[in-house]
């Protein structure tokens, strides 16, 4: 594992113990050992926050954010460069706009994207993709 960008779908799988949770847990363990780097776009971090809030309530959402803060995941802000590339992905591919941010971060950081969302197949020729 070198550098992995986690999509909201992968983080949600981890928190909800769904298919792929064990892979995310393995990556977290490797990052703790210093054997790789985990990144997440702040836009996708926000997706996790609102998704948990909608399904489990505000308290659960705030607890999840506190738990994410304890994990070896670097939350990357959406600066001009990331936002520009996200907009270009949106213009060229059938992909939700929030997903374009994680794709842009993946490309700019020369990383591999870990996701459960099959929509990312639309950009699989442009970025390294690992579907779980």
Q: Which functions belong to the PLM regions below?
A:
Residues 1-40, 53-66, 130-132:
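Short, well-structured N-terminal submotif of metal-dependent ribonuclease cores
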Residues 11-12, 45, 120-121:
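A generic structural signal for short hydrophobic patches within well-formed alpha-helices
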Residues 51-54, 72:
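Helix-loop "lid/cap" segments that line or gate small-molecule binding pockets
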Residues 19, 43-44, 78-81, 101, ...:
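Short beta->alpha linker loops
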Residues 74-114:
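Active-site neighborhoods of divalent-metal-dependent phosphate/nucleic-acid chemistry enzymes
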